[in-house]
Amino acid sequence: DVETSLRNLRTGYIDLYQLHNLPEKDIEKVFGPGGAYEALTAAREAGKIGHIGVTAHSADALKILVEDCADRIETVMFPYNIVEDQGRDVLALAREKGIGTIAMKPLAGGNLDDWELALRYIAASGVIDIMIPGMGSPEEVDRNASVNLAAPLTAEDLSRCDAVRKELGTQFCRRCGYCAPCPNGIDIPSNFLMANYARKYGLAGWAEQRYKAMPYHAGSCVMCGACEKRCPYGLPIRDMLEGVAKVFGY
């Protein structure tokens, strides 16, 4: 809740407070009487937050939020990158309605190697106001800040984008962590990450060492399917874990 967020952030005010990962089935409840939105408006009136936004992973949920809740929200945050542009039309509508648009997963959960092309692609889309790439070091901050977002995409750039789409497809882990917890203790995103290092980057030995150090491995999956019910991207996680087990042998 708001009070917990204020304590965790050690502040008395949050500029933008977002209702996170709203599924279609919860939207009416969240914005109805006694719902979370009502509590946030009270917090805003009390001067504890400044603005209210929403985030979603489903294009259908995004559409409902923009079409039915535009008078109550100030921002929407949605995955948008070279391989995920299914929200383009609704994000364009959001901007027409005066709703700020935020691109999450601009590097597709770390799966896009060409960070400069990835950020320029989003900037050139015309439907995004702000993008939020994850940064783990001062060097990555400087790197992202150095990108010329005003540079238009060339024919060569667009060809590279097409190549990325063909290589990556849509069935890849964004490392959001919503699949957790695994009943067998498997760190699913990290298992996928190590397999990617082995297959994609030629770091088989390096990845094998780190995979071995994990307490639970892909081969421990009992196919219960709990993770797939939680995945906002509908990934066939069990099949993907089988693929990881084949890479490392267990």
Where are each of the predicted segments found?
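Glycine/proline-rich, positively charged
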Residues: 1-102, 107-110
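Structured C-terminal cap/extension of enzyme domains
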Residues: 89-250
